[in-house]
Amino acid sequence: MRSSLSFVGFMGSGKTSIGKRISLFFNIPFLDLDEYIEKKLKKSISDIFIEKGEEYFRNIETESLREAFSLYPKIVLSTGGGVVLREENRRILREKSKVIYLKGEFENLMKHLENKEEHEKRPLLKKGREELYNLWKKRLPLYESCADIIVEVDNKDIDEITFEIIERLRDD
């Protein structure tokens, strides 16, 4: 595999879990962008949203995205679900990596997020279901616009998804 990989998709699609497995398989460093931001600011994403607002977070996210690609010559990067909202971020992802979009239907993604622990980690889950659906719908074309590879995650377990990605990367 010649380039870095970035995983995009809505929350609950498996970006971090699958990214870690792909990282191990190809022996390339893994970085979760949200975790990187939390360590950098010494605050949870939820607290950053509450204390500073989404615009502040999105600025830090763009800055951190640039840093991630400059820190590692080759990386497997798991992004936050909203990273694609900024054209600049989509451009950085496309220029610096092969982008894999983990695509899932809204109801299936929500099933992955039903436990309380997820609600505490993800500030957007505090929004109503209709608002989340609208976010998902708004982001779909943005994910697709920057994706080199689109992988359907519905009705597949993590092993099936990981294997499919490895096969598709080998074919590249």
UniProtKB/Swiss-Prot annotation:
UniProt remark on cofactor binding: Binds 1 Mg(2+) ion per subunit.
A single BP term in Gene Ontology: chorismate biosynthetic process
Residue numbers binding ATP: 12-17, 122
List of residues binding substrate: 34, 58, 81, 139
PROSITE patterns: SHIKIMATE_KINASE
Top EC group: transferase
One function term, GO molecular function aspect: ATP binding
Keyword Magnesium: yes
EC id: 2.7.1.71
Assigned keywords, A-Z: Amino-acid biosynthesis, Aromatic amino acid biosynthesis, ATP-binding, Cytoplasm, Kinase, Magnesium, Metal-binding, Nucleotide-binding, Transferase
Top-level taxonomic group: Bacteria
Coiled coil: none
Localization, UniProt: Cytoplasm
Cofactor dependence: Mg(2+)
Listed SUPFAM superfamilies: P-loop containing nucleoside triphosphate hydrolases
Pathway of action: Metabolic intermediate biosynthesis; chorismate biosynthesis; chorismate from D-erythrose 4-phosphate and phosphoenolpyruvate: step 5/7
Classification via Gene3D superfamilies: P-loop containing nucleotide triphosphate hydrolases (3.40.50.300)
Principal subcellular localisation of the protein: cytoplasm
Residue positions binding Mg(2+): 16
InterPro entries in the cross-refs: P-loop_NTPase (IPR027417), Shikimate/glucono_kinase (IPR031322), Shikimate_kinase/TSH1 (IPR000623), Shikimate_kinase_CS (IPR023000)
One Pfam assignment: SKI
Family statement drawn from the similarity comment of this UniProt entry: Belongs to the shikimate kinase family.
Described function: Catalyzes the specific phosphorylation of the 3-hydroxyl group of shikimic acid using ATP as a cosubstrate.
PANTHER family: SHIKIMATE KINASE, SHIKIMATE KINASE 1, CHLOROPLASTIC
Assembly and binders: Monomer.
Protein name: Shikimate kinase
Organism for this UniProt entry: Dictyoglomus turgidum (strain DSM 6724 / Z-1310)
Lineage, broadest ranks: Bacteria, Pseudomonadati, Dictyoglomota, Dictyoglomia, Dictyoglomales
Gene symbol of the encoding locus: aroK
